[in-house]
């Protein structure tokens, strides 16, 4: 084994990076196809968000961009699968870039889930300012930090295929509507823990793909170096081909002795 290959780890937390990356690529390809089918069925059945008669230019642009994005997700996932199978490290770069963007959007989604908390803290700071163990300045500072998070969450106005609240069909995003304060806080804590767990898993999968990229790149560089050092092999001509070749006897020189059987 080449010493450079030994420096690249082929496992990540007891999992082979090539197997994990291949499984991830197959999963993304299947999910892209299912997402395209689901979106097409919604448009065909004329859901409220997809009726052409009720949408303007913005809704039409949003619908077209949704299909374009799903198609790009499928192409990038297929590129990842081809890159792993055929050892083309460059085909892994689009997926790595997509994962970075997806991770940033997930962070903004997590920050956007705290958009309703500043109002609770303001109410608590006004009603419990005298009996609270925390100083009012601390509560105001925390409220200011959460307001900054709210400002960051304003950049979540992305198309509907990436809008977290528009995809909240199962109501797994905590909301303060018809929910007591204590229950809402508990739901936010559970939601944050679960979402952070998902982010950690995304980082782990990104690490697997990155190590697979380095491994394939190192393997290709070793193979190219090995091929460059190989000597060119020349195949000798047969007897008939040698007789048909022009004579290399210099002009005026002695002719070679005739061939004779012993």
Curated annotation (Swiss-Prot):
Any one biological process term the GO annotation gives: positive regulation of lysosomal membrane permeability
Tissue and organ distribution: Preferentially expressed in adult hematopoietic tissues. High levels in lymphoid and myeloid tissues. Highly expressed in peripheral blood leukocytes, thymus, spleen and lung, followed by placenta, liver and kidney.
Factors inducing expression: By retinoic acid.
InterPro entries in the record: LAPTM4/5, LAPTM_4A/5, LAPTM_transporter
GO molecular function, one term: protein sequestering activity
Localization terms from the record: Lysosome membrane
Keyword Transmembrane recorded: yes
Spans through the membrane: 19-39, 64-84, 92-112, 134-154, 184-204
Function: May have a special functional role during embryogenesis and in adult hematopoietic cells.
Assembly: Binds to ubiquitin.
Record's protein name: Lysosomal-associated transmembrane protein 5
Source organism of the structure: Homo sapiens (Human)
Lineage: Eukaryota, Metazoa, Chordata, Craniata, Vertebrata
Gene: LAPTM5
